[in-house]
Amino acid sequence: GRCFCMTKIDIYSGFLGAGKTTLIKKMIKEAYHGQKLVLIENEFGEIGIDGGFLAEAGIQINEMNSGCICCSLKGNFEKALNMVIHDYAPDRVLIEPSGVGKLSDVIRAVQAVQNDAVVLNMFTTVVDANKCKMYMKNFGEFFNDQVENAGCIVMSHTENMSEKKLSECVELLRKHNATAVIISTPVSELTAEQLLSAMERKDTLAEELARLAEE
């Protein structure tokens, strides 16, 4: 019989300059090795991963666009996602919403997709540890939504931060998300496998989904 394989949906959110690109590149290179991937980014996507890198990683590339299969989340997202799954049958679809996108909206858009072959696998938010406080104050609605709905929060630019500053940032994040796995170790010091196992922790994922359903 035909192998029925689920396509995992991995969502990476975060503000411009937070380090999403670096993280996604690392995951593509090291953790998703040998898997069939499709990358979907918003029309404001700033991933800037060049076509060469994607081709090397064997990621499906859409000639019309410099880089990857991009489809705007503004357009008919469900149709686009179903088409990608039908055409390419990927192991994973990586979604990178725009920096100011609300993570909850993206999760809901994926949940609305009527396709049994799709499983919402993880939603990770990358947070620039140096700007944590400022973003909460100035972009509260969007930033807090990304923090509150994350199953895993990866803090970036933590290399030169003092312990005090670091724990202040973790405390702020904890106020908005009590259950997410928070990674404060510099991404460069972790293996992609370590990152993946933290991102894919199912218990936090279930809690986030249950909480979203209540809203």
Predicted segments, located by residue:
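Short, Lys/Arg-enriched N-terminal segments with co-localized hydrophobic residues
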Residues: 1-5
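Nucleotide-state-sensitive switch-loop elements of NTP-binding domains
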Residues: 7-13, 18, 22-136
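Conserved beta-strand/loop subsegment of P-loop NTPase cores
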Residues: 38, 93-94, 118-127, 147-158, ...
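Short, hinge-like loop/turn segments at secondary-structure boundaries
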Residues: 55-58, 112, 141-143, 171, ...
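A short alpha->loop->secondary-structure connector
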Residues: 111-118, 143-144, 170-180
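Short histidine/acidic/glycine/proline-rich micro-motifs that form metal-
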Residues: 132, 159-160
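Flexible active-site lid/hinge loop adjacent to a nucleotide/diphosphate
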Residues: 137-149
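C-terminal accessory "lid"/substrate-recognition subdomains
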Residues: 149, 161-215
